[in-house]
Every structure is written in C-alpha cells, then in structure tokens.
From Swiss-Prot:
A GO MF term: rRNA binding
Naturally occurring in which organism (per UniProt): Levilactobacillus brevis (strain ATCC 367 / BCRC 12310 / CIP 105137 / JCM 1170 / LMG 11437 / NCIMB 947 / NCTC 947) (Lactobacillus brevis)
Quaternary structure (record): Part of the 30S ribosomal subunit. Interacts with proteins S7 and S18. Binds to IF-3.
Protein family membership: Belongs to the universal ribosomal protein uS11 family.
UniProt keyword annotation of Ribonucleoprotein present: yes
A cellular-component GO term for this protein: ribosome
Protein name: Small ribosomal subunit protein uS11
Keyword Glycoprotein applies: no
Length: 129
C-alpha cells in the first residue's frame, strides 16, 4: 500500500493594519493575544509559554516578555496599531502595555474590561501568611 502524502495548509500571512491587543493579567500568569477588529486571533503569547514556571510567571518582567513576543509575531502579519483591552488584577498589566508600545506598535486606546460581579459567587478566603 502506498502512503498518501497529506499536505498541511500553511499559515497564510494576513495583511492587517489595525487590531486589538487583549491582555489577560491574572494573579498567576499573563496572557497576551492580538486579534483583528472582528476578534480573529493573529498572534498570542503567555508567560508560561515562554518558559517561566511557578511564581515567576506572575512577574511584570514575564508579562513584558510575553507582550514583546506577541507583538513581534503580529508585526509579521502587518499590525501597526492596536487598541488595548486589559482584563484582570495581575501585576503584568502596565508592563505588558509598555512592551507593546516599545515593540513599535502604536496604541490608539486603552480599555479596562475587567469583569465586575454584581454580587456573584463568594470570593476565595483571605490568605493568612
């Protein structure tokens, strides 16, 4: 029996000028995803994906590296300006925004889209260290 050679579709380089940078900064990690205006993913990165483990993932430096990686990958698709949507209380919020700006992408607007409960579920108990 002859083996059939299956050809995988190569990732098509889109040429998109403007997009949205979604920064999800949790207490444990920071995820940066750059999408087009419709919400289709162009590039993403996270502190954990870059090799940071444990408590190092939650540092501002890890968030900066994740944002740089996502910005570089999105520039290959032609992204020149982004609107930033920040979600979560993590420590990597500001450093991720600065890293995107330093990578040469123009930031047109910054929105805080952190979900606020209208008295939903009970929050976790306070840590006693």
């Amino acid at each position: 029996m002859a083996t059939r050679k299956t050809s995988r579709k190569r990732r098509v380089k889109k040429n998109i000028e403007a997009g949205v940078a979604h920064i999800h900064a949790t207490f444990n990690n920071t995820l940066v995803m750059i999408t087009d205006v419709q919400g289709n993913a162009i590039a993403w990165s996270s502190a954990g994906a870059l090799g940071f483990k444990g408590s190092r993932k939650s540092t501002p430096f890890a968030a900066q590296m994740a944002a740089e990686a996502a910005a570089k990958a999105s520039q290959e698709h032609g992204i020149k300006s982004v609107e930033v949507a920040v979600k979560g209380p993590g420590s990597g919020r500001e450093s991720a925004i600065r890293a995107i700006q330093a990578a040469g992408i123009e930031i047109t607007a910054i929105r805080d889209v952190t979900p606020v409960p209208h008295n939903g579920t009970r929050p976790p108990k306070r840590r006693r260290v």
